[in-house]
C-alpha cells in the first residue's frame, strides 16, 4: 500500500517561486487569488502534482494525503490569532499559498454562509471557553466527525495547513477510513447502514440561533457503491432512534476506532482529508496563550462528486445551508 505521506522538501524552492506569483493580499480579492492559484497549480512539481491527482481520482485506503516538508514562514510568522475572521488586509502567509496551490489542483475552495461569518479561509487556534463541538477547543477531545455530513453540499476535502504546532507536540489529528473499517463489519451491519437514513443533529453554527433544534437532518452512514461506500458519521450528532440502527452505528463506531491512525501536524504540513470516506477527530493539547499556540489554516474543497456542483461555481464562493433530508 502506498504511503499517504508526500515528501515535499525537494520542491521547496519551486513552490516558493510559485507562491511569490500569487497576489500579496489574498482576501482583498479572494476569487482572483484563487483563480491565479488554479493557473499556477498547473505548474506544480511533477511528483506533487501526480500525488494530488491520484488522490483526487481514486482516494486511498488511509483516507488522507499528507504533504510534508513544505516551506513555512518561520521567523516572519505573526503571533497566533485570537479572533476571527482574519483581517482583510493580512498579507499572504506561505502556508496559505500552499493551501491555495494544492487545493486548486483538487477543486473549489468553498465557504459556508453560517460558519465563520461565511469566510472561505479559516484560522484554527485555541480559544478559551470554546463550545465542545468547535474546532477552537483545545483541552478536550474534538470527537470523530465527517465534516458537515448533514449538509447537502458537504465538502469533498478538508485541508489543514500547519504554520505552528502546539508547544508539546501532543495534538494529533485522528483519521478513521471507511475503506479500512468496512472489512470489520459483518454483512448484517453493512446492509443495515447502507442507504439507511439516520436522524442527525447539526453543529451550532447551522442551528439558526436555536439552542437545540433536534435532529433536523438525515444522514446515510454508508452510501454510494456498496462494495466501496462513502461514509457519513458524527459521533456527537448522529442520533439513531431505532434499536437496530443504534446497534449498527455502534458497530461502525467501534470499527472506525479500531482502524484510526493519528497524525501530528508540524509546520510545513498540509493534511488533505477525504471527507467522503473518513471521519476525523483531534486529541487534547494545552495552550499557553503566549502568541505561539497551535495555528492551523483550514479550507473546504468541493468537487463534482455527489452532486456538489451544478455548474458556474467559482473557487471562493460562499454557499448557504441545506440539511440532508
Swiss-Prot record:
Q: What class of enzyme is it?
A: oxidoreductase
Which cofactor does this sequence's record say it needs?
Fe(2+)
Which SUPFAM superfamilies does this one have?
Clavaminate synthase-like
Q: Where does 2-oxoglutarate bind?
A: 294
This entry's comment on the bound cofactor is:
Binds 1 Fe(2+) ion per subunit.
UniProt GO BP: antibiotic biosynthetic process; clavulanic acid biosynthetic process
Q: Gene3D superfamilies, per this entry?
A: Clavaminate synthase-like (3.60.130.10)
Residue positions binding Fe cation: 145, 147, 280
Q: In which pathway does it act?
A: Antibiotic biosynthesis; clavulanate biosynthesis; clavulanate from D-glyceraldehyde 3-phosphate and L-arginine: step 3/8; Antibiotic biosynthesis; clavulanate biosynthesis; clavulanate from D-glyceraldehyde 3-phosphate and L-arginine: step 5/8; Antibiotic biosynthesis; clavulanate biosynthesis; clavulanate from D-glyceraldehyde 3-phosphate and L-arginine: step 6/8
User: Which molecular-function annotations from GO does this UniProt entry contain?
Assistant: clavaminate synthase activity; iron ion binding
Which residue ranges traverse the bilayer? none
InterPro entries of this UniProt entry? AlphaKG_dependent_hydroxylases, Clavaminate_syn-like, Clavaminate_Synthase, TauD-like_sf, TauD/TfdA-like
Q: Which UniProt keywords apply?
A: Antibiotic biosynthesis, Iron, Metal-binding, Oxidoreductase
Lineage top rank: taxon:
Bacteria
Describe the reaction catalysed, as an equation: deoxyamidinoproclavaminate + 2-oxoglutarate + O2 = amidinoproclavaminate + succinate + CO2; proclavaminate + 2-oxoglutarate + O2 = dihydroclavaminate + succinate + CO2 + H2O; dihydroclavaminate + 2-oxoglutarate + O2 = clavaminate + succinate + CO2 + H2O
PANTHER family, per database record: GAMMA-BUTYROBETAINE HYDROXYLASE-RELATED (PTHR10696), TAUD_TFDA-LIKE DOMAIN-CONTAINING PROTEIN (PTHR10696:SF56)
Its family remark reads:
Belongs to the clavaminate synthase family.
**What is the official name of this protein in its record?**
Clavaminate synthase 2
Instruction: Tell me the organism.
Output: Streptomyces clavuligerus
Amino acid at each position: 500500500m502506498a504511503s499517504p505521506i508526500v515528501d515535499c522538501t525537494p520542491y521547496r524552492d519551486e513552490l516558493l517561486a510559485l507562491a511569490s506569483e500569487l497576489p500579496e493580499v489574498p482576501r482583498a480579492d479572494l476569487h482572483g487569488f484563487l483563480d491565479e492559484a488554479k493557473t499556477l497549480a498547473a505548474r506544480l512539481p511533477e511528483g506533487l502534482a501526480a500525488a494530488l491527482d491520484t488522490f483526487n481520482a481514486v482516494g486511498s485506503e488511509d483516507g488522507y494525503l499528507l504533504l510534508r516538508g513544505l516551506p513555512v514562514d518561520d521567523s516572519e510568522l505573526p503571533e497566533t490569532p485570537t479572533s476571527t475572521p482574519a483581517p482583510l488586509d493580512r498579507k499572504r502567509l506561505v502556508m496559505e499559498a500552499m493551501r491555495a496551490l494544492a487545493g486548486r489542483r483538487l477543486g473549489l475552495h468553498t465557504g459556508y454562509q453560517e460558519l465563520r461569518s461565511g469566510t472561505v479561509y479559516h484560522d484554527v487556534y485555541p480559544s478559551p471557553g470554546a463550545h465542545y463541538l468547535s474546532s477552537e477547543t483545545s483541552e478536550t477531545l474534538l470527537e470523530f466527525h465527517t465534516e458537515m455530513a448533514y449538509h447537502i453540499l458537504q465538502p469533498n476535502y478538508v485541508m489543514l495547513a500547519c504554520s505552528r504546532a502546539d508547544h508539546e507536540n501532543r495534538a494529533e489529528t485522528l483519521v478513521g477510513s471507511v475503506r479500512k473499517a468496512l472489512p470489520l463489519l459483518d454483512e448484517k451491519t453493512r446492509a443495515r447502514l447502507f442507504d439507511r437514513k439516520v436522524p442527525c443533529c447539526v453543529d451550532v453554527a447551522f442551528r439558526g440561533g436555536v439552542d437545540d433544534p433536534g435532529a433536523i437532518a438525515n444522514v446515510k452512514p454508508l452510501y454510494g457503491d456498496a462494495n466501496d461506500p462513502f461514509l457519513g458519521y458524527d459521533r456527537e450528532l448522529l442520533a439513531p432512534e431505532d434499536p437496530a440502527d443504534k446497534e449498527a452505528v455502534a458497530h461502525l463506531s467501534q470499527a472506525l476506532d479500531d482502524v484510526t491512525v493519528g497524525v501530528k501536524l508540524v509546520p510545513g504540513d498540509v493534511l488533505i482529508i477525504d471527507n467522503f470516506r473518513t471521519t476525523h477527530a483531534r486529541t487534547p493539547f494545552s495552550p499557553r496563550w503566549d502568541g505561539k499556540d497551535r495555528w492551523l489554516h483550514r479550507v473546504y474543497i468541493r468537487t463534482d462528486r455527489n452532486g456538489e456542483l451544478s455548474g458556474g461555481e467559482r473557487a471562493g464562493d460562499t454557499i448557504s445551508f441545506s440539511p440532508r433530508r
